Amino acid sequence: MFKESKSQKDDAECILHLIETCTGLINKYGYPDNDTRTASLVNIRLVSYSSIGIANLLDSWSKGDNTVQQIIPQLLGLTQVDTKSVRLMGDSLHKSSKLSLILLGQFQIENCIVNICNALGVKSKSIGFYNKANALLTHLGLGSSSLDILNTGAQIRNSLHSNGIHHGYKGADFRSNLKGVQYDFIDGQKVSCATFPHIAHALECSVGVLDEIYSAPQLKSYPSLILDTYAMIIGLGGDAEDEP
């Protein structure tokens, strides 16, 4: 879902919908926790829990009574509570939470697609995500619109890595429309589609593409687990997350 943000509460509502979408797919397919098709969704949900928690905290900080507004700075470790320090802390939490959501969420989507490519033996001419995603979607018979969806989150992530400026491949612009929400990335210009609602909506639409991928006959007939190779390399176990 997408909702123009007028408050931290609106941000939290958009992130909640992303969480619910991930939960729906986890329950729909029922893959084991160490299968990349579940692990990716679980990990997107985990980072979303963090972002929604910060959004709710900032909302309470701005709207709460005097007691709440006194307690939160203490919990955050603010030794000096004035307008400037409160604003700086709030901005820092908001920006870092937003960056974490797109960075970690997009990584999980890209990692999942790489793992599926490896399992199905899908090769691409380049190691880059765009080419790997294109090769997989072509192999599964899915359309170019799905590739545009997956690329939208990647473009947001890349722009935030460049102080919000889009640097297109060979100077190219990129535009997409996700369920009526327009995303425009103009080379050399600051992007205006990297708000929390834009990020949550783009990730949710990418999760929808994962749903299409999981539903493809080639995946439905796959006889075994598709392990998360990144988790294996860094030594993560296959334990399920604890619900907050």
Regions found by a protein language model. Give the residues of each.
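Extended intrinsically disordered or low-complexity regions, especially N/C-terminal cytosolic tails and loops
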Residues: 1-103, 144-155, 171-244
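Short, contiguous, well-structured surface segments enriched in hydrophobic/aromatic residues
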Residues: 76-77, 98-131
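Charged/polar positions within long, soluble alpha-helices
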Residues: 113-121, 158-169
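A structural signal for alpha-helix termini and helix-coil/disorder junctions
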Residues: 119-122, 139, 209-212, 216
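Short, charged amphipathic alpha-helical segments flanked by flexible coils
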Residues: 122-140, 168-186
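A contiguous pocket-lining binding segment that forms or flanks enzyme active sites
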Residues: 133-163
